[in-house]
Protein backbone atom coordinates (compact mmCIF):
# COMPACT_ATOMS: atom_id res chain seq x y z
CA UNK A 1 0.00 0.00 0.00
CA UNK A 2 2.84 2.36 0.81
CA UNK A 3 4.36 2.02 -2.66
CA UNK A 4 0.95 2.42 -4.28
CA UNK A 5 0.24 5.53 -2.21
CA UNK A 6 3.58 6.98 -3.24
CA UNK A 7 2.83 6.36 -6.91
CA UNK A 8 -0.56 8.01 -6.62
CA UNK A 9 1.02 10.99 -4.85
CA UNK A 10 3.27 11.33 -7.89
CA UNK A 11 0.82 10.58 -10.70
CA UNK A 12 -2.26 12.46 -9.49
CA UNK A 13 -0.60 15.88 -8.98
CA UNK A 14 1.12 15.53 -12.37
CA UNK A 15 -2.13 14.77 -14.20
CA UNK A 16 -4.07 17.46 -12.36
CA UNK A 17 -1.45 20.15 -13.03
CA UNK A 18 -1.23 19.18 -16.71
CA UNK A 19 -5.03 19.46 -16.93
CA UNK A 20 -4.90 22.86 -15.21
CA UNK A 21 -2.67 24.12 -18.01
CA UNK A 22 -5.00 22.61 -20.62
CA UNK A 23 -8.00 24.36 -19.06
CA UNK A 24 -6.07 27.63 -18.91
CA UNK A 25 -5.24 27.46 -22.63
CA UNK A 26 -8.83 26.49 -23.47
CA UNK A 27 -10.14 29.51 -21.55
CA UNK A 28 -7.54 31.68 -23.27
CA UNK A 29 -8.81 30.55 -26.68
CA UNK A 30 -12.38 31.30 -25.59
CA UNK A 31 -11.29 34.72 -24.33
CA UNK A 32 -9.58 35.42 -27.67
CA UNK A 33 -12.83 34.42 -29.39
CA UNK A 34 -14.89 36.76 -27.20
CA UNK A 35 -12.51 39.68 -27.71
CA UNK A 36 -12.40 39.12 -31.47
CA UNK A 37 -16.20 38.99 -31.47
CA UNK A 38 -16.39 42.50 -30.07
CA UNK A 39 -16.44 42.10 -26.30
CA UNK A 40 -14.50 44.86 -24.55
CA UNK A 41 -11.44 43.54 -22.70
CA UNK A 42 -12.06 46.12 -19.98
CA UNK A 43 -15.58 44.82 -19.39
CA UNK A 44 -14.37 41.22 -19.40
CA UNK A 45 -11.66 41.98 -16.82
CA UNK A 46 -14.04 43.75 -14.43
CA UNK A 47 -16.73 41.08 -14.52
CA UNK A 48 -14.39 38.10 -14.17
CA UNK A 49 -12.47 39.69 -11.31
CA UNK A 50 -15.64 40.84 -9.58
CA UNK A 51 -17.02 37.30 -9.65
CA UNK A 52 -13.69 35.87 -8.55
CA UNK A 53 -13.43 38.33 -5.64
CA UNK A 54 -16.95 37.54 -4.45
CA UNK A 55 -16.12 33.84 -4.45
CA UNK A 56 -12.69 34.23 -2.87
CA UNK A 57 -13.81 36.31 0.10
CA UNK A 58 -15.85 33.61 1.90
CA UNK A 59 -13.70 30.81 0.51
CA UNK A 60 -10.51 32.32 1.98
CA UNK A 61 -11.98 32.17 5.50
CA UNK A 62 -13.13 28.60 4.90
CA UNK A 63 -9.71 27.63 3.55
CA UNK A 64 -7.96 28.90 6.71
CA UNK A 65 -10.71 27.91 9.15
CA UNK A 66 -8.40 25.68 11.22
CA UNK A 67 -5.53 28.17 11.36
CA UNK A 68 -4.96 30.81 14.01
CA UNK A 69 -4.59 34.39 12.82
CA UNK A 70 -1.68 35.62 14.92
CA UNK A 71 -0.72 38.61 12.76
CA UNK A 72 -3.21 41.53 12.48
CA UNK A 73 -4.15 41.78 8.83
CA UNK A 74 -5.95 45.10 8.34
CA UNK A 75 -3.11 47.44 9.26
CA UNK A 76 -1.79 50.44 7.34
CA UNK A 77 1.35 48.63 6.04
CA UNK A 78 -0.69 45.61 4.96
CA UNK A 79 -3.26 47.79 3.18
CA UNK A 80 -0.45 49.48 1.23
CA UNK A 81 0.86 46.05 0.24
CA UNK A 82 -2.62 44.91 -0.76
CA UNK A 83 -3.07 48.00 -2.94
CA UNK A 84 0.28 47.45 -4.67
CA UNK A 85 -0.39 43.74 -5.18
CA UNK A 86 -3.75 44.56 -6.73
CA UNK A 87 -2.22 47.30 -8.87
CA UNK A 88 0.61 45.19 -10.30
CA UNK A 89 -0.92 41.71 -10.20
CA UNK A 90 -4.46 42.51 -11.33
CA UNK A 91 -4.85 46.02 -12.73
CA UNK A 92 -1.66 46.42 -14.77
CA UNK A 93 -1.14 42.75 -15.51
CA UNK A 94 -4.61 41.84 -16.68
CA UNK A 95 -5.32 44.99 -18.68
CA UNK A 96 -2.08 44.63 -20.63
CA UNK A 97 -2.42 40.84 -20.90
CA UNK A 98 -5.94 40.83 -22.32
CA UNK A 99 -5.18 43.73 -24.65
CA UNK A 100 -2.12 41.80 -25.78
CA UNK A 101 -4.21 38.68 -26.32
CA UNK A 102 -6.69 40.65 -28.43
CA UNK A 103 -3.82 41.59 -30.78
CA UNK A 104 -2.05 38.21 -30.86
CA UNK A 105 -2.83 34.56 -30.04
CA UNK A 106 -2.67 32.07 -27.14
CA UNK A 107 0.74 30.77 -28.24
CA UNK A 108 2.19 34.28 -27.83
CA UNK A 109 0.64 34.43 -24.36
CA UNK A 110 2.55 31.23 -23.54
CA UNK A 111 5.86 32.53 -24.90
CA UNK A 112 5.68 35.88 -23.11
CA UNK A 113 4.47 34.31 -19.87
CA UNK A 114 7.63 32.20 -19.81
CA UNK A 115 9.71 35.40 -19.57
CA UNK A 116 8.68 35.87 -15.93
CA UNK A 117 11.70 34.25 -14.21
CA UNK A 118 14.04 36.10 -16.56
CA UNK A 119 12.46 39.44 -15.65
CA UNK A 120 12.49 38.48 -11.96
CA UNK A 121 16.21 37.72 -12.15
CA UNK A 122 17.00 41.07 -13.79
CA UNK A 123 14.83 42.96 -11.31
CA UNK A 124 16.57 41.22 -8.42
CA UNK A 125 19.92 42.31 -9.83
CA UNK A 126 18.72 45.88 -10.32
CA UNK A 127 17.34 46.08 -6.77
CA UNK A 128 20.45 44.56 -5.21
CA UNK A 129 18.62 41.50 -3.93
CA UNK A 130 21.23 39.09 -5.28
CA UNK A 131 23.56 39.53 -2.32
CA UNK A 132 26.68 37.37 -2.46
CA UNK A 133 25.98 36.39 -6.05
CA UNK A 134 28.74 34.11 -7.30
CA UNK A 135 29.14 34.75 -11.00
CA UNK A 136 31.37 31.68 -11.32
CA UNK A 137 28.78 29.29 -9.86
CA UNK A 138 26.81 26.99 -12.14
CA UNK A 139 23.57 28.32 -10.64
CA UNK A 140 24.31 31.86 -11.72
CA UNK A 141 25.62 30.80 -15.11
CA UNK A 142 22.48 28.75 -15.69
CA UNK A 143 20.22 31.66 -14.79
CA UNK A 144 22.12 34.09 -17.01
CA UNK A 145 22.13 31.69 -19.97
CA UNK A 146 18.48 30.80 -19.33
CA UNK A 147 17.56 34.49 -19.31
CA UNK A 148 19.31 35.04 -22.65
CA UNK A 149 17.55 32.01 -24.13
CA UNK A 150 14.18 33.26 -22.86
CA UNK A 151 14.69 36.65 -24.48
CA UNK A 152 15.86 34.96 -27.70
CA UNK A 153 12.61 32.99 -27.77
CA UNK A 154 10.61 36.19 -27.28
CA UNK A 155 12.55 37.86 -30.10
CA UNK A 156 11.87 34.94 -32.46
CA UNK A 157 8.21 35.03 -31.44
CA UNK A 158 7.92 38.65 -32.54
CA UNK A 159 9.94 38.77 -35.76
CA UNK A 160 9.33 35.35 -37.32
CA UNK A 161 5.96 33.80 -38.02
CA UNK A 162 6.76 31.40 -40.83
CA UNK A 163 4.20 29.32 -42.70
CA UNK A 164 1.08 27.87 -41.12
CA UNK A 165 1.51 24.44 -39.57
CA UNK A 166 -1.94 23.48 -40.83
CA UNK A 167 -2.99 25.48 -43.89
CA UNK A 168 -6.45 25.24 -45.38
CA UNK A 169 -6.78 21.78 -46.98
CA UNK A 170 -8.84 20.98 -50.08
CA UNK A 171 -12.54 20.53 -49.54
CA UNK A 172 -13.19 17.43 -47.44
CA UNK A 173 -15.27 16.42 -44.42
CA UNK A 174 -12.34 17.35 -42.17
CA UNK A 175 -11.82 20.75 -43.75
CA UNK A 176 -15.54 21.47 -43.60
CA UNK A 177 -15.53 20.55 -39.90
CA UNK A 178 -12.57 22.84 -39.20
CA UNK A 179 -14.19 25.64 -41.19
CA UNK A 180 -17.29 25.27 -39.05
CA UNK A 181 -15.21 25.50 -35.87
CA UNK A 182 -13.55 28.69 -37.13
CA UNK A 183 -16.96 30.35 -37.21
CA UNK A 184 -17.34 29.78 -33.47
CA UNK A 185 -13.78 29.87 -32.10
CA UNK A 186 -10.79 32.11 -32.85
CA UNK A 187 -7.12 31.27 -32.35
CA UNK A 188 -5.53 33.81 -34.68
CA UNK A 189 -6.71 36.39 -37.21
CA UNK A 190 -4.67 37.85 -40.06
CA UNK A 191 -5.64 41.34 -38.92
CA UNK A 192 -3.91 40.85 -35.55
CA UNK A 193 -1.10 43.27 -34.67
CA UNK A 194 1.48 40.68 -33.62
CA UNK A 195 4.22 43.11 -32.54
CA UNK A 196 1.90 45.29 -30.44
CA UNK A 197 0.34 42.24 -28.82
CA UNK A 198 3.77 40.84 -27.96
CA UNK A 199 4.89 44.16 -26.48
CA UNK A 200 1.79 44.40 -24.29
CA UNK A 201 2.22 40.82 -23.12
CA UNK A 202 5.89 41.45 -22.32
CA UNK A 203 4.87 44.49 -20.25
CA UNK A 204 2.29 42.34 -18.49
CA UNK A 205 5.02 39.83 -17.62
CA UNK A 206 7.23 42.61 -16.27
CA UNK A 207 4.32 43.77 -14.12
CA UNK A 208 3.77 40.31 -12.67
CA UNK A 209 7.50 40.06 -11.95
CA UNK A 210 7.30 43.27 -9.92
CA UNK A 211 4.24 41.83 -8.19
CA UNK A 212 6.30 38.75 -7.37
CA UNK A 213 8.86 40.83 -5.46
CA UNK A 214 6.12 42.56 -3.45
CA UNK A 215 4.30 39.36 -2.56
CA UNK A 216 7.41 37.53 -1.34
CA UNK A 217 7.70 39.69 1.75
CA UNK A 218 3.93 39.94 2.15
CA UNK A 219 3.31 36.23 2.67
CA UNK A 220 6.18 36.05 5.14
CA UNK A 221 4.35 38.56 7.32
CA UNK A 222 0.85 37.25 6.54
CA UNK A 223 1.10 33.49 5.89
CA UNK A 224 -2.64 32.97 5.36
CA UNK A 225 -2.24 32.95 1.61
CA UNK A 226 -5.85 32.77 0.47
CA UNK A 227 -6.84 35.78 2.57
CA UNK A 228 -4.06 37.79 0.97
CA UNK A 229 -5.18 36.63 -2.48
CA UNK A 230 -8.78 37.56 -1.67
CA UNK A 231 -7.81 41.02 -0.41
CA UNK A 232 -5.60 42.01 -3.32
CA UNK A 233 -8.06 40.52 -5.81
CA UNK A 234 -10.75 42.83 -4.42
CA UNK A 235 -8.38 45.81 -4.49
CA UNK A 236 -7.39 45.09 -8.09
CA UNK A 237 -11.03 44.67 -9.11
CA UNK A 238 -11.91 48.11 -7.74
CA UNK A 239 -8.96 49.64 -9.58
CA UNK A 240 -10.01 47.93 -12.81
CA UNK A 241 -13.62 49.07 -12.37
CA UNK A 242 -12.61 52.73 -12.03
CA UNK A 243 -10.25 52.55 -15.00
CA UNK A 244 -12.69 50.62 -17.19
CA UNK A 245 -15.48 53.11 -16.51
CA UNK A 246 -13.36 55.74 -18.28
CA UNK A 247 -12.10 53.42 -21.01
CA UNK A 248 -15.53 51.96 -21.80
CA UNK A 249 -18.17 54.67 -21.17
CA UNK A 250 -20.72 53.03 -23.49
CA UNK A 251 -23.28 51.48 -21.14
CA UNK A 252 -24.43 49.01 -23.78
CA UNK A 253 -20.98 47.38 -23.66
CA UNK A 254 -21.64 46.50 -20.01
CA UNK A 255 -24.91 44.71 -20.67
CA UNK A 256 -24.71 40.97 -20.10
CA UNK A 257 -26.81 38.63 -22.17
CA UNK A 258 -27.43 34.91 -21.85
CA UNK A 259 -24.77 33.90 -24.37
CA UNK A 260 -21.26 32.45 -24.56
CA UNK A 261 -19.69 35.66 -23.24
CA UNK A 262 -21.61 35.30 -19.98
CA UNK A 263 -20.72 31.62 -19.68
CA UNK A 264 -17.07 32.47 -20.30
CA UNK A 265 -17.08 35.14 -17.58
CA UNK A 266 -18.58 32.68 -15.09
CA UNK A 267 -16.19 29.87 -16.04
CA UNK A 268 -13.14 32.13 -15.92
CA UNK A 269 -14.14 33.65 -12.58
CA UNK A 270 -14.75 30.28 -10.92
CA UNK A 271 -11.74 28.53 -12.43
CA UNK A 272 -9.28 31.34 -11.77
CA UNK A 273 -10.36 32.19 -8.25
CA UNK A 274 -11.24 28.85 -6.68
CA UNK A 275 -10.31 25.79 -8.73
CA UNK A 276 -6.85 26.61 -10.07
CA UNK A 277 -5.79 28.54 -6.98
CA UNK A 278 -6.73 25.70 -4.62
CA UNK A 279 -5.07 23.07 -6.80
CA UNK A 280 -1.84 25.03 -7.11
CA UNK A 281 -1.63 25.80 -3.40
CA UNK A 282 -2.32 22.14 -2.57
CA UNK A 283 0.26 20.84 -5.07
CA UNK A 284 2.91 23.29 -3.89
CA UNK A 285 2.42 22.11 -0.30
CA UNK A 286 2.58 18.46 -1.37
CA UNK A 287 5.47 18.62 -3.84
CA UNK A 288 7.42 21.75 -2.94
CA UNK A 289 7.63 25.33 -4.23
CA UNK A 290 9.19 24.48 -7.59
CA UNK A 291 6.64 21.89 -8.65
CA UNK A 292 3.84 24.09 -9.97
CA UNK A 293 6.06 26.48 -12.03
CA UNK A 294 7.54 23.50 -13.87
CA UNK A 295 4.20 22.98 -15.62
CA UNK A 296 4.16 26.41 -17.30
CA UNK A 297 5.80 25.09 -20.50
CA UNK A 298 2.91 22.62 -20.81
CA UNK A 299 0.95 25.60 -22.11
CA UNK A 300 3.02 25.46 -25.31
CA UNK A 301 2.09 21.81 -25.78
CA UNK A 302 -1.62 22.40 -25.24
CA UNK A 303 -1.71 25.53 -27.40
CA UNK A 304 0.02 23.62 -30.20
CA UNK A 305 -2.34 20.66 -29.86
CA UNK A 306 -5.44 22.85 -29.87
CA UNK A 307 -4.08 25.09 -32.62
CA UNK A 308 -3.33 22.22 -34.99
CA UNK A 309 -6.27 19.96 -34.11
CA UNK A 310 -9.15 22.42 -34.35
CA UNK A 311 -7.94 25.36 -36.45
CA UNK A 312 -6.50 26.01 -39.90
CA UNK A 313 -4.42 29.04 -40.90
CA UNK A 314 -3.93 29.86 -37.23
CA UNK A 315 -0.70 28.42 -35.82
CA UNK A 316 2.67 29.33 -37.37
CA UNK A 317 5.90 27.36 -37.23
CA UNK A 318 7.74 30.47 -36.07
CA UNK A 319 5.44 31.12 -33.13
CA UNK A 320 5.80 27.55 -31.88
CA UNK A 321 9.59 27.74 -32.36
CA UNK A 322 9.81 30.98 -30.40
CA UNK A 323 7.68 29.58 -27.59
CA UNK A 324 9.77 26.38 -27.49
CA UNK A 325 13.00 28.39 -27.21
CA UNK A 326 11.48 30.48 -24.42
CA UNK A 327 10.37 27.29 -22.69
CA UNK A 328 13.92 25.92 -22.85
CA UNK A 329 15.27 29.06 -21.20
CA UNK A 330 12.51 28.93 -18.59
CA UNK A 331 13.34 25.33 -17.64
CA UNK A 332 17.07 26.14 -17.50
CA UNK A 333 16.40 28.96 -15.05
CA UNK A 334 14.19 26.69 -12.96
CA UNK A 335 16.87 23.98 -13.01
CA UNK A 336 19.49 26.52 -11.93
CA UNK A 337 17.38 27.67 -9.00
CA UNK A 338 17.24 24.20 -7.45
CA UNK A 339 20.97 23.58 -7.83
CA UNK A 340 23.24 23.94 -4.83
CA UNK A 341 26.46 25.89 -5.07
CA UNK A 342 29.65 23.88 -5.41
CA UNK A 343 31.22 23.78 -1.93
CA UNK A 344 34.67 24.01 -3.54
CA UNK A 345 33.83 27.39 -5.03
CA UNK A 346 34.97 30.34 -2.93
CA UNK A 347 32.32 32.97 -3.13
CA UNK A 348 32.11 35.84 -0.70
CA UNK A 349 28.79 35.83 1.10
CA UNK A 350 27.36 37.89 3.91
CA UNK A 351 26.67 36.09 7.17
CA UNK A 352 23.06 37.18 6.99
CA UNK A 353 22.70 36.36 3.31
CA UNK A 354 19.10 35.60 2.42
CA UNK A 355 17.68 33.42 -0.29
CA UNK A 356 17.24 35.26 -3.57
CA UNK A 357 13.75 36.19 -4.64
CA UNK A 358 13.31 33.33 -7.08
CA UNK A 359 14.07 30.78 -4.34
CA UNK A 360 11.54 32.23 -1.92
CA UNK A 361 8.68 30.97 -4.02
CA UNK A 362 5.51 30.79 -1.97
CA UNK A 363 2.03 29.39 -2.52
CA UNK A 364 0.77 32.91 -3.25
CA UNK A 365 3.18 33.22 -6.16
CA UNK A 366 2.09 29.84 -7.41
CA UNK A 367 -1.57 30.59 -6.91
CA UNK A 368 -1.84 33.68 -9.00
CA UNK A 369 1.32 34.31 -10.91
CA UNK A 370 2.45 34.54 -14.51
CA UNK A 371 -0.18 34.21 -17.24
CA UNK A 372 -2.37 31.75 -15.44
CA UNK A 373 -4.91 34.47 -15.00
CA UNK A 374 -5.42 34.85 -18.71
UniProtKB/Swiss-Prot annotation:
Its source organism is Arabidopsis thaliana
Where does it mainly reside?
Answer: membrane
GO annotations of cellular component type: membrane
Disulfide cysteine pairs (residue numbers) = none
Classification of source organism: Eukaryota, Viridiplantae, Streptophyta, Embryophyta, Tracheophyta
Transferase among the record's keywords? no
Please indicate if the UniProt record lists Cell wall biogenesis/degradation as a keyword.
no
Annotated TM spans: 11-31, 42-62, 82-102, 107-127, 145-165, 194-214, 228-248, 255-275, 292-312, 315-335
Limits of the EamA domain: 26-155
Family per similarity comment = Belongs to the drug/metabolite transporter (DMT) superfamily. Plant drug/metabolite exporter (P-DME) (TC 2.A.7.4) family.
The molecular function terms of the Gene Ontology recorded here are: transmembrane transporter activity
| Keywords for this protein | Membrane, Transmembrane, Transmembrane helix
Q: How does it sit in the membrane?
A: Multi-pass membrane protein
| Compartments (UniProt record) | Membrane
Q: Which InterPro entries match?
A: EamA_dom, WAT1-related
Name used for this protein in its record: WAT1-related protein At1g60050
Please give the coiled-coil regions recorded for this protein. Answer: none
Amino acid sequence: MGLMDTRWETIVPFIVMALMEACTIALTILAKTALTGGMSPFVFIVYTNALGSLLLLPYSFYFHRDESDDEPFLTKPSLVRIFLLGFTGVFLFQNMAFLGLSYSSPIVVCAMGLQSPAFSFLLSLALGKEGGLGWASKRTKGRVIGTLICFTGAFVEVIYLGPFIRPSPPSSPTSNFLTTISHYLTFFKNSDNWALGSLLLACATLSISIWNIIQLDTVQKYPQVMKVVSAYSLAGTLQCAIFSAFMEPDLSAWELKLNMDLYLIIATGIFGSIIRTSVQVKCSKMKGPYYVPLFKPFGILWASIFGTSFFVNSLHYGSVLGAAIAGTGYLLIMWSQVQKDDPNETVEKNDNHQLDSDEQTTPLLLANGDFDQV
